[in-house]
Amino acid sequence: MKKRNWRLVLRRVLNLVFSRIVVTGVLLLLQAFWLFALFYWLADYAKWFGGVGIAMSVIMCLALIRQDSTVPEFKISWMILFSVMPVQGGILYLLWGDKRPALGLRHRLERAEDAMAPARKDDPDAAAALQRQDPRAALTARYLHDYGPMPVCGGTAAKYYPDGQSMFADMLPALQGAQHSIYVESFIIGMGEMWGQIHEILRQKAAAGLDVRVIYDDAGCLSLLPHNYAEMMRTDGIRAFSFNRCVPVLNLVMNNRDHRKIMVIDGQIAFTGGVNLADEYINKIVRFGYWKDSGVRLEGPGAASLANIFLTFWKAKYPDEDLDAGCDLPAAVPMETDCLVQPFADSPVDREAVAKNVYLELINQAQQRLYICTPYLILDNDLLSCLRLAAKRGVDVRIYTPGVPDKPTIYQLTRSYFPHLLRAGVKIYSYTPGFLHAKTWLVDDRIAAVGTVNLDYRSLYLHFENSVLIYGGAVLDDVRRDLAEIEKESAAVTLADCRTGFFGTLYSAVLRLVAPLC
């Protein structure tokens, strides 16, 4: 018995040591050590490289200044690095200065966008209805139409979910009722009850001849799924791939993650929001207390827009694969509804920060109330200034953040912004029962945003994201009630709560300096 136990322990240790995440981490550390050794060697020859380093720093600084689409925080962080380490900073910038995906991926995504453009059907009646209903919101919708690029959709019923478990309960019958296709895209897929039930339905539907496709992010699932999980799904008839495979090479392209969460059934029903496909998101397992999330269900033409986003990604992966928009995106049946919706996607491929610009629009058009749920609050100057100004002009601005952190360093960084906001009159609440993962906005009880976008640099500049704007309708009452419940279970943050002492303040300042570079 003891011998068998030792073998079991040894097998587990070997599996851990040679696991993909450990091997990748070790190789990355070795490359970091090599870079450090190179920089140390360059320091010994500073007198030979000094002039070259200064010239390189000047060129890099001028190049940064010319980039009008680059946020000032990003420029400042790099310029400080150039000043401290002229030669080394220039090398690092050449390696990691461009936050966009690799050139090949950019070109494939751009071609896929063009290929899927004919399937994005405008709804002139919905656009006209929004113009009559809310002219200011119609301007935001026009921006999204041109740069999202996604139209406003009428005839789309929307249902809001205040947690992952209620959303999951509706996912299962929708999946079981699929007749044509199922598309699933998720940042995280974790083995357990949630994914187990979904996967079994997908397997059955694929066996019945339906078009079943799955996209998952490789980094998000690095420690959760076997490295060949996409191949394993393909043996079940499920077409699948992992996005942006993690390789043990130090480059910023690995930061471009697919953070989207989309499920589309028959092009008619769609789910999206903050909920990944793992058990903590439906509170079957406890990680950081109660996991508070949000999501939305669309039925009608708005679901087809999310299918378009999914298939654009698919087309980028398989550019030579024929994609008949009329077949793969059947016309959605309009539903009786009292709201308009506008799903949209954001991508680091271009230099258009769509999600950030939409959020700036929502802040600037708020007249009475602006309520925001976000798990992370790492703001650039544009967002920080707009939130402060909104509070100063009399808008009731409330921000709900987690009381229990999932990442202590990010939690510290989030709280470093609290004093600036509180002094301007913004109210901040800390959700005490657990981790608040919802990404929900409510503006004047007339517009809501529900999706995957966090208020941090990674979501706004590095990740592939998606969200839905909901204009009017009774569904906004459900959003408002959920936010009221969150506030009841939260503690109001005061300036006294934000005192960290000299070293805490210094630590936060360093974190804010490096945040744009990560």
Predicted segments, located by residue:
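Helical hairpin unit composed of two closely spaced alpha helices linked by a short loop
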Residues: Y376-V397, P402, K407
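Glycine- and other small-residue-rich loops at beta-strand/loop junctions that grip anionic moieties
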Residues: F187, Y376, I410
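Short glycine/threonine-rich loop-to-helix capping motif typified by GTGT followed
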Residues: S385, Y411-R415
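Catalytic-core elements of nucleic-acid end-processing and repair enzymes
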Residues: K439
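N-terminal localization/anchoring segments of enzymes in phospholipid and broader phosphate metabolism
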Residues: M1-N357, E361, Q365, P405, ...
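Active-site donor-binding acidic/aromatic loop of nucleotide-activated sugar
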Residues: I428-T432
